[in-house]
Curated annotation (Swiss-Prot):
Record key words, sorted: Decarboxylase, Lyase, Pyrimidine biosynthesis
Lineage: Bacteria, Pseudomonadati, Pseudomonadota, Gammaproteobacteria, Chromatiales
Protein role: Catalyzes the decarboxylation of orotidine 5'-monophosphate (OMP) to uridine 5'-monophosphate (UMP).
Catalytic activity, EC: 4.1.1.23
Family: Belongs to the OMP decarboxylase family. Type 1 subfamily.
Top EC class, one word: lyase
Organism: Alkalilimnicola ehrlichii (strain ATCC BAA-1101 / DSM 17681 / MLHE-1)
Biological or metabolic pathway of the protein: Pyrimidine metabolism; UMP biosynthesis via de novo pathway; UMP from orotate: step 2/2
PANTHER family to which the protein is assigned, alphabetical: OROTIDINE 5'-PHOSPHATE DECARBOXYLASE
GO function term, MF aspect, one: orotidine-5'-phosphate decarboxylase activity
Residues annotated as the enzyme's active site: K62
UniProt cross-references to Gene3D superfamilies, sorted A to Z: Aldolase class I (3.20.20.70)
Record's subunit section: Homodimer.
InterPro entries registered for this protein in UniProt: Aldolase_TIM, OMPdecase, OMPdecase_AS, OMPdecase_bac, OMPdeCOase_dom, RibuloseP-bd_barrel
Protein name in UniProt: Orotidine 5'-phosphate decarboxylase
Length: 235
């Protein structure tokens, strides 16, 4: 099973193309992320199918509800065999602590991460929804709240990963979506970085979607990402 930093986002509406991509990639070289659209369409059996193929699965459902409800949802998420699950840090310390406690009751506890500020959010978006910005300050506040609640790490923009590492320590995970190599389009993400820059800035895991999933040769695109990371490791 892979210990790669790369997590490929299976942003598909149904199981067919998701499993087809999984069969073209390698569990030795990446983990896979299942989000809301795919999970709602296909359910736990999709996660099971990926786990049986040898993949670590990040179940990206971003739970945000009252503590008891989130605790129950996390137990159910753990039962799928997921390697990592997440909640929204905006749910508060009590909710995150309840999630962590619930996962601790499971036999093979998944990693728990907390979403800080979505990578589609800019400072203007934060002002629009009434959150004190700028984004990097909001991310740090939420990361420290998550760490205090016993969460394993956060989901944050790669642009804030170094700040989170400084505030929360090296052992606190920084899972970074919005990763776009120079050869890929930016898409709808507002705060993006290249894979090499993200790792240099403190990211522990990189979530990559369209640069791989929409590539004519997904395994070749994955190899290109691996080469970028290897070159960064050598600097």
């Amino acid at each position: 099973m892979s210990h790669s930093r790369l997590i490929i986002a299976l942003d598909y509406p149904e199981a067919g193309p998701a499993l087809a991509l999984a069969d073209r990639l390698s569990p030795e070289r990446c983990a896979l992320k299942v989000g809301k659209e795919l999970f709602v369409a296909e359910g736990p059996q999709l996660v099971d199918a990926l786990v049986r193929r040898g993949y670590r699965v990040f179940l990206d459902l971003k739970f945000h509800d009252i503590p008891n409800t989130v605790a129950g949802a996390c137990r159910s998420a753990a039962a799928t065999g997921a390697w990592m699950v997440n909640v929204h840090a905006l749910g508060g310390a009590a909710m995150m602590a309840a999630a962590r406690e619930a996962l601790g009751e499971t036999g093979d506890r998944p990693l728990l991460t907390a979403v800080t500020v979505l990578t589609s959010h800019s400072d203007a978006t934060l002002r629009e929804i009434g959150l004190a910005g700028p984004a990097d300050a909001a991310v740090c506040r939420l990361a420290e709240l998550a760490r205090g609640a016993g969460v394993d790490g956060v989901v944050c923009s790669a642009r804030e990963a170094a700040l989170v590492r400084e505030r929360c320590g090296d052992g606190f995970l920084r899972v970074t979506p919005g990763i776009r190599p120079a050869w890929a389009a930016k898409g709808d993400q507002a705060r993006v970085l290249s894979p090499a820059d993200a790792v240099a800035g403190g990211a522990t895991h990189l979530v990559v979607g369209r640069p791989v999933t929409r590539a004519d040769e997904p395994l070749a695109a994955l190899a290109r990402l691996e080469r970028e990371l290897a070159a960064q490791d050598e600097t």
